[in-house]
From Swiss-Prot:
Names of required cofactors: FMNH2
Protein's name in the database: Chorismate synthase
EC numbers for this chain: 4.2.3.5
Keywords: Amino-acid biosynthesis, Aromatic amino acid biosynthesis, FAD, Flavoprotein, FMN, Lyase, NADP
Gene Ontology CC entries for this record: cytosol
A GO molecular-function descriptor: FMN binding
UniProt organism field: Prosthecochloris aestuarii (strain DSM 271 / SK 413)
GO BP term (any one): aromatic amino acid family biosynthetic process
Function (record text): This reaction introduces a second double bond into the aromatic ring system.
Length: 397
């Protein structure tokens, strides 16, 4: 089983990740990790932090001669902004200067609850770990699972369908064409846009909306589409709640900072339709697997992959730090006050789509390993190919 942990504060010396359970024998190049980190940093509407950081991961263990060796993989990403925070974020030295405590929480952020839960008199420790800066470590860790899945013929891609009022959720013909080439083709096309949209008109509308929000001191959220191609039938199970594939994928997406909703297939539209208009009918032709003309289930039925493209949708709320702050209060005096302002982005939806690709990768990798078993890549692929052959045999007449 692949699992990972991250550590580090937003303005601490570094972010770290430990990845355990990665099979041996997987070829990994530095760019497999660093290209994903670079994708995460892009996107129209990002703040000044992205001008400081140039994220690259140092590999401290678990890889030898360019291949995984089955032991835990340790990754570290330097925070270049640390040099500006050595006093405020010192681990042991007591600062000689007085550092004012932050006591005015931001609505929509972890500030108030985190401060009370952990007994802080200052919001700073909450801000540092709750920050989406942590996702840099996650993207690095999960990039390893993406490489593993590629060896198994599974690709993950994403694009942004809406930012604020701009965009539309309906699938475009261009999206379907790109998916036929594999989900990675979809991501490459989205990466060509500064907002990761596929349609030029929507891109221009999104840029204008972000510009307006920035001018108003406001922020914007949006909707992200994630697609996974090449997933064989039968990953996941209905047997126990904690092994359900759809539940695990949804949990992974909801673990991303500011993601507040997840949809699989066209779930919310399905809820308003009769079953006769929802369920993906199956058609059989001699000597071939069943064919479906729709994919409203999003590639998952009974919490198992059904062989179709897996389609996930995530809703990201607007970032909680506004340059035109909302009403709040000062916890030290219990008096009304405008909320605290922290350096932040106007819109991070494009980056969130890249993070979404990352976090679903270990879920799919574990579902695959649960089906095949095995400790090294060659063994796993041999078993996967045998399983695929057995599926094909089932459908032979």
């Amino acid at each position: 089983m692949i699992r990972y942990f991250t550590a580090g504060e937003s303005h601490g010396p570094a972010l770290s990740a430990i990845v355990e359970g990665m099979p041996a024998g997987i070829s990994i190049a530095p760019e497999d990790i660093n290209d994903e980190l670079a994708r995460r940093q892009r996107g129209y509407g990002r703040g000044g932090r992205m001008n400081i950081e140039t994220d690259t991961a140092a590999v401290l263990s678990g890889i030898r001669f360019g291949k995984t060796i089955g032991s835990p993989i340790t990754l570290q990403i330097e925070n270049r902004d640390w040099k500006n925070w050595t006093v405020k974020m010192a681990q042991f030295e007591q600062p000689e200067e007085n550092i004012p405590a932050i006591t005015i929480p931001r609505p929509g952020h972890a500030d108030l609850t985190g401060m009370i839960k952990y007994g802080f008199q200052d919001i700073r420790p909450v801000i540092e770990r709750a920050s989406a800066r942590e996702t840099a470590a996650r993207v690095a860790a999960c990039s390893l699972a993406k490489v593993f899945l590629r060896h198994a013929g599974i690709q993950i891609g994403s694009y942004v369908s809406a930012i604020g009022p701009a965009g539309e959720i309906a699938p475009s013909p261009k999206m379907q064409e790109l998916l036929s080439q594999g989900a990675a083709s979809l991501s490459r096309a989205a990466d060509a846009s500064c907002v990761r949209m596929l349609d030029k008109e929507n891109e221009e509308a999104a840029i204008a909306a972000i510009d307006k929000a920035k001018e108003d001191g406001d922020t914007l959220g949006g909707i992200i589409e994630v697609f996974i191609t090449g997933v064989p039938l039968g990953l996941g199970t209905y047997v126990q709640h904690d092994r359900r594939l759809d539940a695990a994928l949804a949990a992974a997406l909801l673990s991303i900072q500011a993601v507040k909703g997840v949809e699989i297939g066209s779930a919310f539209d399905n809820a308003r339709r009769p079953g006769s208009q929802v369920h993906d009918e199956m058609y059989v032709e001699d000597g071939s697997a069943p064919v479906r003309k729709t994919n409203r289930a999003g590639g998952i039925e009974g919490s198992m992959s059904n062989g179709q493209v897996i389609h996930l949708r995530a809703a990201m709320k607007p970032i909680a730090t506004l340059m035109s702050p909302l009403h709040s209060f000062d916890l030290s005096s219990m008096e009304a006050h405008l909320s605290h302002i922290e350096r932040s982005d106007t819109c991070a939806v494009p980056a969130c789509s890249v993070i979404a690709e990352a976090v679903v990768a270990p879920i799919l990798a574990n579902a695959l390993l649960e089906k095949t078993g095995g400790d090294h890549l060659e063994e796993i692929l041999e078993r996967l190919n045998a399983y695929k052959a057995s599926i094909a045999k089932q459908f032979q007449t």
